[in-house]
Amino acid sequence: MGQKINPIGLRLGINRTWDSRWFAGKNEYGKLLHEDVKIRAILHKELKQAAVARIVIERPHKKCRVTIHSARPGVVIGKKGADIDKLRKKVADITASDVVINIVEIRKPELDATLVAESIAQQLERRVAFRRAMKRAVQSAMRLGAEGIRINCSGRLGGAEIARMEWYREGRVPLHTLRADIDYGVATAFTTFGTCGVKVWIFKGEILEHDPMAQDKRMAEGDNSRPRRDAA
């Protein structure tokens, strides 16, 4: 069933950890979970142009720490930090606690599955030929060091009367191998012919040690991203 399941969920606790990192009792859990959903929704809405790939939420004692992984940190921060202050106030209104927002710059957006999927979806909305968009993304990822990539596009591609699925793959994408570091992203293109779905799998190598934080450590060491600014 490795072909069917979300490869991120399959590897949680093995070489990847959760994007919500906190513990709560039975009475508080539902409330905090809904807060996380609202925080992510409002940040994605406000930061549409900032190429946000991932939002990590941590809750130390009476605080809320939000880490935004973005390919355009300048858009998130805004002029003299004005935009990030607005975001902090909006998140604080939801959580009613002290909020800290950190920004991590993604140095190689071509190797982030979510950003690749969103880029292809945006090109489909601009009526770029879907084969050209897919091939360009595959070539860019392999050139920058990916060991394998697969891209699926489905829907009324090119305005066809009958919906279908097209896919490209280059290199290895071992979905059954649990130690494989596989990034997965999805996006939806809203075209005049209807919606088109985009799925991207990127294989970046194998993580041999059993460490749920291994992928985050790789990113922190500069493999794919680097810290940009801590906003208190």
Curated annotation (Swiss-Prot):
SUPFAM superfamilies: Prokaryotic type KH domain (KH-domain type II) (SSF54814), Ribosomal protein S3 C-terminal domain (SSF54821)
Keywords: Ribonucleoprotein, Ribosomal protein, RNA-binding, rRNA-binding
InterPro entries in the record: KH_dom, KH_dom-like_a/b, KH_dom_type_2, KH_sf_prok-type, Ribosomal_S3_C_sf, Ribosomal_uS3_bac-typ, Ribosomal_uS3_C, Ribosomal_uS3_CS
An example Gene Ontology molecular-function term: mRNA binding
Protein origin, superkingdom: Bacteria
Ranges where the KH type-2 domain occurs: 39-107
SMART domains: KH
UniProt-listed PROSITE patterns: KH_TYPE_2, RIBOSOMAL_S3
UniProt record similarity statement: Belongs to the universal ribosomal protein uS3 family.
Protein name in UniProt: Small ribosomal subunit protein uS3
Lineage, top ranks: Bacteria, Pseudomonadati, Pseudomonadota, Alphaproteobacteria, Hyphomicrobiales
